[in-house]
């Protein structure tokens, strides 16, 4: 297959020593399972390949997903998608206010419900001092958490007998459940594609 020729590696699992049997898992990991996300990843990888003046006989490796040249460009794209979505319902000031919250996570891309509440409390203190009209999405901690989940900015994590379950809104949404609810009192993680733009996490610890 042409895919296996250009991406001849197994995608590493983030939390175990095992690997997935296809590099395509890396693409899904960074995407929201939308075709345009996959095409954007391919476009950035191709652009970087050319900019690095690599030989035409070379192929891609898993390290290409960890290079700043990729993570910055792709993270900027994903954040732009969030901004475009919000622009239909909220002002640019609301968008900037949303981004302000992530400063209170102190660089952490993974956090507990208790840590989320602590960050939200500090976020509210900032709003009370600096914002005249508070947006509806940050009225309460749970409303704000649901808002982040609806935007696919965060997922909830639940431990199972096999391995952790990651609940994403885009996966949980179905014809019979068009407005899935985020799990409260769980653990949470910011989407991989947004970490760089939000200045969260150092890198992914592939084992």
Task: Briefly describe each language-model feature range.
Residues 2-207:
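C-terminal leucine-rich, beta-strand-based interaction scaffolds used for sensing/assembly
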